[in-house]
């Protein structure tokens, strides 16, 4: 079901924009309520067909590679579905920890691939290589992964037999967290504070827009960073006219407004959720990471809910709050929040 859910959410999101003319027309058109689905119906059908082909092809390729590595068929299917949909449900208590190095490396690669904007794959299939390589989001995505993995490797190298094992474990956990898959090969809850902090920051970061991953998304963070840079520039040059651009194209005021509103709502949900579950009297790290990991659809957190823990410790009320966070995060906040508006129910 999480394999179907991963693709279902992706198609639902991308049916809200014209794929061919827009190529990831800046995050918010792809991930917030936008153009009428009816007007886009012909493109929606062709888009869904292309996306399903890419999604299924990557999933089949992963299953084959896992089988070649000696993983049983049932395990391969479960692992591939969990990786593709970034659901991360494992059939073993140690997640992916007991599988071979080959299996772990293959899953690492495919977790990262499923976190890439699927529009990039479409551009590659249509041989628009230069346009695909110009994607600021994808370049930033890979930069964050590599930089984070290298920093963690340096920080945890003393915990492993050699630096290569530390590097492999770092890349696996970074790939798992940033794509919101949630697999684990080791108890990173025991890692040094620096490494755990990096993983928490990656939980917020999330994968690319138009992927099966969750989180805030790289594109939103890029737009926010560009917005801050623009404001600083205007402080120095009040009369300057400076436009925010993504992939060489100017970003509209509507997109920036939607991005800012998303972040405000996101922070409000985080603050409210932490406050409510704090009545369970668990430590701040447990409460904070519980909210962050559920809202971003990652899975494991830190402290009492690390890779070897679970959410069974929370009260029924807290579980309801965290369940709401999971649904809201997976649906990009606004679709589920609309259900709480009186105007929504007056239409039925």
What are these regions (language model features)?
Residues 1-348:
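Membrane-proximal intracellular helices of multi-pass ion channels
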